[in-house]
């Protein structure tokens, strides 16, 4: 991302082919190499391997209070169900034509991500965590896969 990118374009929302993302940044994001420094945070105990992804404060405020209170109960993670399902978030937001991207994120994406994190809390187990680790590796290799639908049939329904 470019310096001061939060004050340009769509702010904290990144669209497909966003002018703020450099070519090198696109490579890092696509391969998820940009996440390697988070391993240090896992070792320090600041985050876990599986859990809700940390978000910027301005995006955090978009989540309904009832969901925020639940998400606060567990440590953030390097990957999780939201990371897998929203692997293509940039494409989803880019496809939005008749609505402001921030508004769409607030009305549709943030509440659904919150429901996914609550689903994770309600179903947290070694088995679920191992499946999420496996699925994370798969979405890096095959970004368009929908294998999570085979592993987790009881996920909240998505209305967009």
Label each residue range with its predicted role.
Residues 1-160:
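Conserved small/aromatic sequence motifs within transmembrane helices
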């Amino acid at each position: 991302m470019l310096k001061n990118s939060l004050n340009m374009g769509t702010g904290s929302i990144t669209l497909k082919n966003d002018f703020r993302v450099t070519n090198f940044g696109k490579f890092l994001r696509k391969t998820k190499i940009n996440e390697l420094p988070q391993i240090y945070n896992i070792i320090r105990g600041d985050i876990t391997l599986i859990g809700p992804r940390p978000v910027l404060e301005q995006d955090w405020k978009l989540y309904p209070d009832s969901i925020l209170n639940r998400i606060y109960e567990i440590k953030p993670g390097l990957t999780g169900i939201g990371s897998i399902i929203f692997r293509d978030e940039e494409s989803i937001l880019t496809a939005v034509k008749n609505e402001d991207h921030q508004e769409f994120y607030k009305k549709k994406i943030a509440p659904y991500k919150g429901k996914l994190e609550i689903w994770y809390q309600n179903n947290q187990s070694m088995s679920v965590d191992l499946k999420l680790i496996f699925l994370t590796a798969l979405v890096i290799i095959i970004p368009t896969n929908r294998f999570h639908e085979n592993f987790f049939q009881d996920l909240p329904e998505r209305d967009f």
